[in-house]
Curated annotation (Swiss-Prot):
Gene3D superfamilies per the UniProt record, alphabetical: P-loop containing nucleotide triphosphate hydrolases
Example GO BP: dTDP biosynthetic process
Keywords assigned: ATP-binding, Kinase, Nucleotide biosynthesis, Nucleotide-binding, Transferase
Pfam families: Thymidylate_kin
One GO term describing the cellular component: cytosol
Coiled coil (residue ranges): none
Gene Ontology MF term list: ATP binding; dTMP kinase activity
Similarity comment: family membership: Belongs to the thymidylate kinase family.
InterPro entries per record: P-loop_NTPase, Thymidylate_kin-like_dom, Thymidylate_kinase
Protein's UniProt name: Thymidylate kinase
Entry-linked PANTHER family: THYMIDYLATE KINASE, UMP-CMP KINASE 2, MITOCHONDRIAL
Residues that coordinate or bind ATP: G16, I17, D18, G19, A20, G21, K22, T23
Origin species: Xanthomonas oryzae pv. oryzae (strain KACC10331 / KXO85)
EC assignment: 2.7.4.9
Length: 227
């Protein structure tokens, strides 16, 4: 059985400071939901497009100002929404994003740009149905970055990550759920899966689908709950 969520699909954004485990969770959620019959599109920001590539180069070298990075982020996100996110949601897919516009608000905000202006710049971007905020202390995130053999970039200082964490915590967005990312990866996956199943229950009961179809879909998703 293929689980479709028309109209509108389901948009899931995974956020948090560096080292929180966003990429690991995004990949594991995709595998878990696909195994249960969901049609999932996994993506990330910055993307691999021309604007996203410039942004990653900037993260490594620190050559761009906060304003210049913000401009590239918006260009990258416009293209991402138009070419991938909006079409996938229109098909009724589940879209999982490893970072989205809240990261821009947190990181560019930590660099000194006004939060209200950053939110206004992102008004065009579809709001997530589920926003999973992976929260952990910056020293833990930095230790994880070093443990995987990566050298911290200019964003990845304890002071900057503390500022980002504070901004993430203060963002008031619908669908936001705080997940304890200091726990092991299996525990984080279980927390996230339970949140998503609850969101899917709301969507499947309210999108006009036959009751038996929604029930069968939820049974499949619940059966795929991580042990």
């Amino acid at each position: 059985m293929t689980i479709e969520l028309k109209p509108g699909g389901l948009l899931i954004a995974i956020e948090g400071i560096d080292g929180a485990g966003k990429t690991t969770l995004a990949r594991r959620l995709t595998t878990t939901l696909e195994a249960a019959g969901a049609r999932v599109v996994l993506s990330k920001e910055p993307t691999n497009g021309p604007w996203g590539t410039k942004l990653r180069q900037s993260a490594a070298t620190g050559r761009l100002s906060a304003d210049e990075e913000a401009e590239l982020l918006i260009r990258d996100r416009h293209e991402h929404v138009d070419t991938l996110i909006a079409p996938a949601l229109a098909r009724g897919d589940i879209v999982i994003l490893d970072r989205y516009f809240p990261s821009m608000v947190a990181y560019q905000g930590a660099a000194g740009l006004p939060l209200d202006e950053l939110l206004e710049l992102n008004a065009f971007a579809p709001r997530p149905d589920v926003l999973l905020l992976l929260d952990l202390p910056p020293p833990t995130g930095l230790a994880r970055i070093r443990a995987r053999g990566d050298a911290p970039n200019h964003f990845e200082t304890q002071d900057n990550l503390e500022r980002c964490r504070t901004i993430f915590a203060g963002l008031e967005l619908p669908g936001k759920h705080v997940v304890d990312a200091s726990a092991d990866a299996d525990s984080v996956l279980r927390q996230a899966h339970a949140i998503i199943v609850a969101a899917l229950a709301d969507r499947l009961s309210g999108d006009g689908a036959p009751a038996d179809t929604g029930k069968a879909a939820l049974e499949l998703l619940s059966a795929g709950r991580p042990a």
